[in-house]
Design a protein with these regions (language model features):
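Histidine/acidic-residue-rich catalytic or RNA/ligand-binding cores of hydrolases
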Residues: 211-221
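Conserved beta-strand hairpin/beta-sheet module of binuclear metal-dependent hydrolase folds
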Residues: 1-46, 50-52, 149-160
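Metal-dependent catalytic neighborhoods of phosphoester/phosphodiester hydrolases
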Residues: 67-76
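Metallo-beta-lactamase
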Residues: 32-34, 52-64, 90-138, 144-213
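A short, structured active-site edge motif that brings together acidic residues
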Residues: 55, 82-94
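C-terminal regulatory/interaction regions
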Residues: 229-284
Length: 284
């Protein structure tokens, strides 16, 4: 397995994709269309191109993980895209996903992510308990349709379920954009990962973590802290507190990568929406 740095907007350590080599090369998450030049370069470095890929395995359909899927299939019609049952319809018809993302990112959408193309239904495969020799298991919380994957050698491809950690910093940011953050489900997902006792975590943001037990507890602690701050404080207070923590743990460039991988204002919005939905449910 090899990590490909997708160099989002020309910056390293923001978004990564994992290449599974073998008779049928596969990517776990592909990043957005805006990162396709770096993806091509990463594949070329190991004597591959998009046409060699046979499978794309998705943790979830957020644009920084799956935005290029439609373009890749257009270029390579033999490519099979493996995704959760909930996520599959949004690949086939990404209109709702794109409208939601354009509301969130506004005029920056195209620069950040590039075009979002549909994946033909015949190229989509709904993930069961196993795919390509990987154990697939649900890890909702960051997204309701989120999946993680465990390899036979103990690597957990955890998507965003295990948060964001930009090396060399040890800080873990539970990035939590709208629309369907669920803190309780997320904690159960951390339990599900820990129960499998992985030897390492493979993070799209960013890289391989060799202390998974400590990392997962850091993620859980930060999630609880961030959730409480969003419940009781303003956006400005939330952002300021998280910025101070990140800046204390990272150099200036790495702190900037944290922000690019998961803007803090969006995490506030996602967690605030979570609390608002809970209050609406309680009042009903």
């Amino acid at each position: 397995m090899q990590l490909l740095d997708l160099e989002h907007l020309g910056r390293e350590r923001v978004i990564g994709s994992y290449l599974l080599t073998g008779d049928e090369p596969a990517l776990v998450d592909c990043g957005p269309a805006s990162c396709l030049p770096a993806l091509r370069s990463g594949l070329a470095a190991v004597d591959l191109d998009v046409g060699h890929l046979r499978h794309l395995v998705l943790t979830h359909i957020h644009l920084d993980h799956a935005g290029a899927a439609g373009l890749l299939v257009r270029e390579n019609p033999a490519l099979l895209v493996h995704v959760s049952e909930i996520g599959a319809p949004h690949l086939v018809d990404p209109g709702r996903l794109e409208r939601s993302a354009r509301r969130l990112y506004g005029v920056e959408f195209d620069r950040l992510w590039g075009p979002l193309l549909p994946v033909p239904e015949e190229n989509v495969r709904v993930v069961g308990e196993r795919v390509l020799g990987l154990e697939a298991f649900p890890t909702p919380g960051h997204a309701s349709h989120h999946l993680s994957y465990l390899t036979s050698d103990g690597s957990c491809l955890s998507g965003d379920a295990a948060g964001v950690r930009i090396p060399p910093a040890r800080y873990v940011a539970p990035v939590s954009p709208p629309p369907d953050i669920d803190v309780e489900a997320w904690e159960r997902s951390l339990d599900a990962i820990a129960k499998r006792r992985p030897d390492r975590l493979c993070l799209p943001h960013f890289g391989v973590v060799d202390d998974p037990e400590d990392h997962l507890e850091r993620c859980r602690s930060a999630l609880r802290t961030w959730a409480e701050r969003a419940r009781s404080g303003s956006e400005a207070e939330f952002v300021r507190a998280a910025e101070e923590e990140i800046q204390a743990a990272a150099d200036a460039e790495t702190a900037g990568v944290f922000q690019q991988a998961g803007p803090l204002s969006q995490s506030y919005a996602g967690l605030r929406r979570y609390w608002d939905k809970r209050e609406e449910t309680a009042a009903a």
